[in-house]
Amino acid sequence: MENALKRLNALPATEAEAELLACCGASRWVQGLVARRPFGSVAELFAAADEIWRSLGREDWLEAFARHPQIGETAVEKQIKSETGQHISSRWSAEEQSGAQRNSADIVARLAEGNRAYRQRFGYIFIVCATGKTAEEMLAILERRLQNDASAELTIAAEEQRRITRLRLEKLLGAETR
């Protein structure tokens, strides 16, 4: 991980931005993290990533959410609309959502309907850190979160995005465990 951190620190800004965009689609988060380089340790990188994320607001969070495929949607059904980091982000999304890819037609239909209801209610896609969750678990979470008020749900979705971003930073650095 330390060698990967050294490489990230040494990359030209545009290349570092492209790699970090695969971790989080909020451009101000990416720019803020690139501006803070070099990082002395992985822990320092993670702390900066969290600090920057928590300093952002609604529009930044929505920008990050918009770069995700919906839960249950395959990479073929949606190519992430990013000019950089697309192939890495698409692959990571597919891996993270693997629990939603192998399920019954009923679960797929219920996830699709839940996604539509969620987008209609909140104005953005359902964001959940899907790693390690089954489709049934994600559906239950989606159904529970549909009951939230808009403010509470945005806060929850932003925290889920932060968790996704942390996992993707770990992948970027070559870590296999949290």
Features from the language model and the residues they span:
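C-terminal non-catalytic interaction appendages of large macromolecular assemblies
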Residues: 97-178
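Aromatic-anchored, charged helix-turn/loop surface patch used as a conserved interaction hotspot
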Residues: 1-24, 28-114, 163-178
